[in-house]
Amino acid sequence: MIVFLGVLGLLVWLEEKYSMDHVLDGLDFATALDKTVVEPGEDFSWTMTINNRKRLMVPYLQMREQIPAGLVFSENGENVAAKSSGDHLSVLYLKGCQKTELERRVLLKKRGRYFFRGVSAEAGDFLGLQTALETYPELKEIVVKPAPSGWEELPRLLGGYAGEYVVKRSLFEDPVLIRGFREYTGREPLRSISWVQSARQSRFLVKEQENMTDLSCTILLDVECRDEEREAELLEQCFSMVRSICEELEKQRIAYDFQTNGVIAGAMGNWNRIGEGLGPGHLETVLEGLGRMTYDCRMGSGEFLSGIRKGLRSGKSLI
């Protein structure tokens, strides 16, 4: 009997040691978002996939998902993050070779860039006496656009300025002058590609056209702010106003380009200008850039406007 108990104890100890040494082996964690750019308050799917690739079960698995501040559940509006840690806590049991997906519908209310930064996993051993901790870093980004400003006077202001032009354009066909060619960036419509020039140069080139009677507009966003206490509030209002102006220009079919002395961070690059264009793709590019903008300033207002004035094409003026 003593020998039997000794052998049983040895087997339990070996199983305990093996499970402790390998409890986190073969575990994979992956975060997935069904959208990369959203409106303020627009819900999106946030899915965590846990895959146990080994045959050994995981009797206790606690996950701490590192999530962005301000994330709330779509159904009830409750904060996703725990008050104590700021992370989202989940506890699971995994069978051997089991794959589990946790899908949540969530939303973010404020403009900006947000990051899901992976998981800290804590797993228990065979007897539940010890735990092992491992971090699985990850970086998933989502961008929230600025909200429209609700500027009620904007349609009237732009309508009065552009109304005469719209009437003339409906009566006469615009003469078009091709000024040259430039490299295709992916934002231009396919009809603007010059297939002859592209074949000659072995790369996509688009025509730079000048509509001789066409009205176009340059939107300038100056982010230099001297009121440090209200900087965030005032700049957020500016981002929303730029969005409303772009959307109104889209409604009136007026081509526009966008320039700023602000910093637009992230995957789009640190660009400061979007060329002249029109259409949903052009608008979405501007809105994503506004969502990515920080409160930093690349140059002062004087230097920014001076550079704009020097680069004006003939027929354009700075008001």
Question: Residues of each region from the PLM?
Answer:
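Membrane-targeting alpha-helical segments
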Residues: 1-8
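Alpha-helix initiation/capping motif
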Residues: 68, 146-147, 174, 279, ...
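An amphipathic, basic-hydrophobic helix/alpha-beta surface used to engage anionic
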Residues: 11-268
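Exposed acidic/Ser/Thr-rich ligand/metal-binding surfaces
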Residues: 303-319
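Residue-level signal for secondary-structure boundary elements
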Residues: 189, 254-257, 295-302, 317
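Short, charged loop segments at secondary-structure junctions
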Residues: 267-306
